[in-house]
């Protein structure tokens, strides 16, 4: 449950090192659920993600490297930030060995740290809606193209392993028209902070 102004944020788990991201993108996506993501101390629990790999046509990297997606082809453990539909920034974590061009899209957070800052940035009070989508969470955390290619284990970005057991739901990815059958969306089952509920 997200903290209020009268409660303290939950304790943080061990910092995630870049080596964490050198595994299968689907394993990383699953294991990121419940981890804490912070940018300059503002963030929360990762409750929803999607995995992408260059071998499937929904991935930005499917047709090879471009000036936009070149970070995906680099080493694991770095942020890949792009603008979606010319409006919202989206943040991804590069995974697998260099050249694999795989990444995890962060879709939703449960706010736990810096909620006041999130509310100012989003001009919104409802804590459940602050980070319930990839564009919403980047606005709440102040993520822009300036964060592209930054390491995930150094300031301003910090990632911490989950500290509690939880049930991870899986399903098909959202808002794509290709490779729609792949169950590469992961999230906290029953969370009220998702961009969209998982089918029951």
Curated annotation (Swiss-Prot):
Q: List the disulfide bonds.
A: none
Recorded GO molecular functions are:
alkylbase DNA N-glycosylase activity; DNA binding
Q: Does the keyword DNA damage apply?
A: yes
Q: Does the keyword DNA damage apply?
A: yes
A biological process (GO) annotation for this entry? base-excision repair
Write down the top EC class of this protein.
hydrolase
EC number(s): the record gives 3.2.2.-
Sorted keywords for this record are:
DNA damage, DNA repair, Hydrolase
Mind telling me which Gene3D superfamilies this protein's record contains? Methylpurine-DNA glycosylase (MPG) (3.10.300.10)
HAMAP family for this protein = 3MGH (MF_00527)
Q: Which family does it belong to?
A: Belongs to the DNA glycosylase MPG family.
Q: What is this protein called?
A: Putative 3-methyladenine DNA glycosylase
Q: List the top taxonomic levels of the source.
A: Bacteria, Pseudomonadati, Pseudomonadota, Alphaproteobacteria, Hyphomicrobiales
């Amino acid at each position: 449950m997200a903290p209020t102004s009268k409660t303290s944020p939950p304790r943080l788990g061990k910092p995630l090192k870049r080596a964490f991201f050198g595994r299968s993108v689907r394993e990383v996506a699953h294991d990121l659920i419940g981890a804490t993501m912070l940018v300059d101390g503002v963030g929360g629990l990762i409750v929803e993600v999607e995995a992408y790999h260059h071998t499937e046509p929904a991935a930005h990297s499917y047709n090879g490297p471009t000036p936009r997606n070149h970070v995906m082809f680099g080493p694991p453990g770095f942020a890949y930030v792009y603008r979606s539909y010319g409006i919202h920034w989206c943040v991804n974590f590069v995974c697998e060995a260099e050249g694999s061009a795989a990444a995890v899209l962060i879709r939703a957070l449960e706010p736990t740290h810096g909620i006041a800052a999130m509310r100012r940035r989003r001009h919104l009070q409802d804590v459940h809606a602050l980070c319930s989508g990839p564009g919403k969470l980047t606005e709440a955390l102040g993520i822009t193209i300036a964060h592209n290619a930054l390491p995930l284990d150094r300031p301003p970005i910090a990632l911490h392993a989950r500290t509690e057991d939880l049930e991870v739901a899986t399903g098909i990815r959202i808002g794509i028209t290709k490779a729609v059958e792949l169950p590469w969306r992961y999230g906290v089952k029953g969370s009220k902070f998702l961009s969209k509920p998982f089918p029951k």
